[in-house]
């Protein structure tokens, strides 16, 4: 029972990370940002447990590249006299994404006792299928639609103007891009990990059809 609850929480956290949204009560702070904040606590604890804690080399290199992108963005803004600051805080966005991912993967590892690419992919696939069902249910049930809109802000309302279905933090370009990525992930698993997922191929195919259709 405890493991089942842990898996359900893992699915919810995966959705919070992959399809972040804001609560109306906390404008400006989405679920991914909150998870990134939690990652600082986890990281501080883990570094404190090590006698010779060091910064990961790959993380350092990625941070330098992100800072360079932000610097180039600043230079182009000044040179071209524009106000497009889309990439000015790119390095912060990268840290938030990585921080949120760190919290999620540490929780999944805690629940399952291990961590693998396949396991993470399975959670992402499950979340996308879940979002499809939520979007469809909201489209045919005004009560559920109103309930969700009553406490979600930001991306929760994307899609209403176009009359399209939308999930929880999942709509328009956000949904299209990430659903496409997950469809490619399913194909990749079927082609390259057949021996390990042979028993579950029907489930992967059903997930593919649900995501493609809805």
Q: Which role fits each region the language model picked out?
A:
Residues 1-10, 52-67, 116-123, 198-202:
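Membrane-interfacial loop-to-transmembrane alpha-helix junctions, especially the N-terminal start
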Residues 1-51, 71-79:
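N-terminal signal-anchor transmembrane segment
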Residues 41-53, 78, 103-115, 187-196:
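Structural signal for the C-terminal ends of transmembrane alpha-helices
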Residues 118-145, 170-214:
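Alpha-helical transmembrane segments of multi-pass inner-membrane proteins
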Residues 64-68, 83-106, 119, 123, ...:
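Aromatic-anchored transmembrane helix interface
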Residues 35-43, 96-105, 177-189:
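Hydrophobic cores of alpha-helical transmembrane segments in multi-pass inner/ER membrane proteins
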């Amino acid at each position: 029972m405890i493991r089942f609850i842990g898996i359900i929480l893992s699915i919810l956290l995966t959705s919070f990370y992959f399809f972040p949204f804001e609560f109306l009560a906390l404008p400006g702070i989405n679920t991914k940002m909150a998870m990134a904040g939690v990652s600082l606590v986890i990281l501080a604890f883990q570094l404190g447990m090590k006698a010779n804690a060091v910064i990961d080399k790959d993380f350092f290199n990625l941070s330098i590249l992100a800072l360079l992108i932000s610097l180039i963005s600043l230079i182009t803004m000044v040179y071209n006299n524009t106000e497009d600051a889309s990439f000015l805080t790119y390095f912060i966005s990268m840290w938030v994404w990585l921080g949120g991912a760190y919290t999620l993967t540490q929780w999944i590892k805690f629940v399952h006792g291990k961590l693998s690419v396949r396991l993470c992919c399975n959670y992402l696939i499950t979340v996308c299928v879940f979002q499809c069902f939520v979007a469809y249910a909201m489209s045919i049930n005004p009560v559920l639609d109103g309930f969700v809109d009553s406490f979600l802000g930001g991306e929760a309302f994307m899609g209403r103007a176009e009359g399209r279905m939308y999930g929880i933090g999942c709509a328009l370009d956000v949904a299209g891009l990430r659903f496409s990525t997950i469809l490619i992930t399913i194909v990749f698993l079927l082609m390259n990990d057949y021996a390990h997922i042979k028993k579950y191929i029907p489930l992967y195919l059903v997930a593919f059809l649900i995501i493609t259709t809805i």
